[in-house]
């Protein structure tokens, strides 16, 4: 009996023990590892994973490996090595590892964000980027769409004058409408029940993608009941049902001679492919309804929660740093005033505001460890070999908090992005990649940067944003999910007297 148990354990150890493809090659230093569970028993059990990985660099260096369950994962925590992975060898490392939770969220690896590299991912990324190009000029200009929604946001916030509120949902609505206009040329009215549906499934997907689920680390555990997977499936189904309803309704009014949004772009590509008018890389099987709705779902998921979260982080840091907030008010008053609303061209004048946004993206990156990459081929990072199929994590937190690259990296110091005179934006370090880089970089970076600047500029022009009367400041600890979230908090909204007076003068 005991002999059989021992034999079984030895067999399992052999099957799941990491095997090197190139026995003579030099591999990154590794944490201790055990069969089946890998390095999990030796990883810190408390604190944020990105910070724990950063601390491990002191012992193992800027690149090291861990066994996450049965999978080898290389952790990269230096900008030079990170750029090698993302840019110099971007094709080598453009894959996505297969995980149970990501497979569910991406409808079995469709879409853009979680899809593995290949013809499907390249096609949908190219089509999505082509859509953003539609919004450069004219009536559909991105800035016009953003400002239209921010104006509605500000009008709504003004109804809470003198009150302390959680601005999460109002900002969510504004950002959702920007994405909806880009995807469908439609927006939601306040009170539309679909807004609550979108917010609920977004939160549900983000929450259950980020449970550090053992089934992602040890795939064979999928055979057992799993509450996290069931919850995730439920939220993904709600998302899919809503997007499918939108898609079916849109098919009736689609016009191939009027391409004005992302759904138009995807449907036109499908029509061309079905009619044999597309190139060899545009297979109609890659443009099924399921593929299309997953890509639209990715744009919503990536574009809404991320921007909403960064706006909240920015407000939180300003509440903690009233001296910076005071300078921002002075900058806006001097360079924009109250006779007009801020525009994108004001980025050249509102330098402290732009520096503040950059500092928030450094201190609290949207995704502290990005989305995991996968080696598509046997390759290398620096002097170390990396086998095909290896998962690679870029620890953006480490890049943005390296004391050798950043003076007092844990301190909120927007002025670090300005020259000493405060008259020019600078790049104080090359260890800064808030939107990633290379083939897997964020396709919505331009949109996100415009939204963040305009939302904050409009809010600061119109409102005094203050700590609530109870003195409760936001927590800056954060909640590391797929997106680095901030705990709910309230801010006291007061319409600025100077803005009120300017509006009164303009109406007479």
UniProtKB/Swiss-Prot annotation:
Name by which UniProt lists this protein: Steroid 17-alpha-hydroxylase/17,20 lyase
A biological-process GO annotation: hormone biosynthetic process
SUPFAM superfamilies per the UniProt record, alphabetical: Cytochrome P450 (SSF48264)
The family this protein is said to belong to: Belongs to the cytochrome P450 family.
Activity regulation statement: Regulated predominantly by intracellular cAMP levels. The 17,20-lyase activity is stimulated by cytochrome b5, which acts as an allosteric effector increasing the Vmax of the lyase activity.
Keyword Cytoplasm on entry: no
Gene name, Swiss-Prot/TrEMBL: CYP17A1
Catalysed reactions, semicolon-separated: a C21-steroid + reduced [NADPH--hemoprotein reductase] + O2 = a 17alpha-hydroxy-C21-steroid + oxidized [NADPH--hemoprotein reductase] + H2O + H(+); progesterone + reduced [NADPH--hemoprotein reductase] + O2 = 17alpha-hydroxyprogesterone + oxidized [NADPH--hemoprotein reductase] + H2O + H(+); pregnenolone + reduced [NADPH--hemoprotein reductase] + O2 = 17alpha-hydroxypregnenolone + oxidized [NADPH--hemoprotein reductase] + H2O + H(+); 17alpha-hydroxyprogesterone + reduced [NADPH--hemoprotein reductase] + O2 = androst-4-ene-3,17-dione + acetate + oxidized [NADPH--hemoprotein reductase] + H2O + 2 H(+)
Coarse class of the protein's main subcellular location: endoplasmic reticulum
Organism encoding this protein: Pan troglodytes (Chimpanzee)
Function comment: A cytochrome P450 monooxygenase involved in corticoid and androgen biosynthesis. Catalyzes 17-alpha hydroxylation of C21 steroids, which is common for both pathways. A second oxidative step, required only for androgen synthesis, involves an acyl-carbon cleavage. The 17-alpha hydroxy intermediates, as part of adrenal glucocorticoids biosynthesis pathway, are precursors of cortisol.
Subcellular location per the Swiss-Prot or TrEMBL entry: Endoplasmic reticulum membrane; Microsome membrane
Ligand binding (heme): 442
Binding site for substrate: 202
């Amino acid at each position: 009996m005991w002999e059989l148990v021992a034999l079984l354990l030895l067999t399992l150890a052999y099957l799941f023990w990491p095997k090197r493809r190139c026995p003579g090659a030099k591999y990154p230093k590794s944490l201790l590892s055990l069969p089946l569970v890998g390095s999990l028993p030796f990883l810190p059990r408390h604190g944020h994973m990105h910070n724990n990985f950063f601390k491990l660099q002191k012992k193992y260096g800027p690149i090291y490996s861990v066994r996450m369950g049965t999978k080898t994962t290389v952790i990269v925590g230096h900008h030079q090595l990170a750029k090698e992975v993302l840019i110099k060898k971007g094709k080598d490392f453009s894959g996505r590892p297969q995980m149970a939770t990501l497979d569910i969220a991406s409808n079995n690896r469709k879409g853009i964000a979680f899809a593995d590299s290949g013809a499907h991912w390249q096609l949908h990324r190219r089509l999505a980027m082509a859509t953003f190009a539609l919004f450069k000029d004219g009536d559909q200009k991105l800035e016009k769409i953003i400002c239209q929604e921010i104006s509605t946001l500000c009008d709504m916030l003004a109804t809470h004058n003198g009150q302390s509120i959680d601005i999460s949902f109002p900002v969510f609505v504004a950002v959702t409408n920007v994405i909806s206009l880009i995807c469908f040329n439609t927006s939601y009215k306040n009170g539309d029940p679909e807004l609550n549906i979108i917010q609920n499934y977004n939160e549900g997907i983000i929450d259950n993608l980020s449970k550090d689920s053992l089934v992602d680390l040890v795939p064979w555990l999928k055979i057992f009941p799993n509450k996290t997977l069931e919850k995730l499936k439920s939220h993904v189904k709600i998302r899919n049902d809503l997007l499918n309803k939108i898609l079916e309704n849109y098919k009736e009014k689609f016009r191939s001679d009027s391409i004005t949004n992302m759904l138009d772009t995807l449907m036109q590509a499908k029509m061309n492919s079905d009619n044999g008018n597309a190139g060899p890389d545009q297979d109609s099987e890659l443009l099924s309804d399921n593929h299309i709705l997953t890509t639209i779902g990715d744009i919503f998921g990536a574009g809404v929660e991320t921007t909403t979260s960064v706006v909240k982080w920015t407000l939180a840091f300003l509440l903690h740093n009233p001296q910076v907030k005071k300078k921002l008010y002075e900058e806006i008053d001097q360079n924009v005033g109250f006779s007009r609303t801020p525009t994108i061209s004001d980025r050249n004048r509102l330098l402290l505001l732009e520096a503040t946004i950059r500092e928030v993206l450094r201190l609290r990156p949207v995704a502290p460890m990005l989305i995991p990459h996968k080696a598509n081929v046997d390759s290398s990072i620096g002097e170390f070999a990396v086998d095909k199929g290896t998962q690679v994590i870029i620890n953006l937190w480490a890049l943005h908090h390296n004391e050798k690259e950043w003076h007092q990296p844990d301190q909120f110091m927007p002025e670090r992005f300005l020259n000493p005179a405060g008259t020019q934006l600078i790049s104080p370090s090359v260890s800064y990649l808030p939107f990633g880089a290379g083939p897997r970089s964020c396709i919505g970076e331009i949109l996100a940067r415009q939204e963040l600047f305009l939302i904050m500029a409009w809010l600061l022009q119109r409102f005094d944003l203050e700590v609530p009367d109870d003195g409760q400041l936001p927590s800056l600890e954060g909640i590391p999910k797929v997106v680095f979230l901030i705990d709910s908090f309230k801010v006291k909204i007061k319409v600025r007297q100077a803005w009120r007076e300017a509006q009164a003068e303009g109406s007479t």
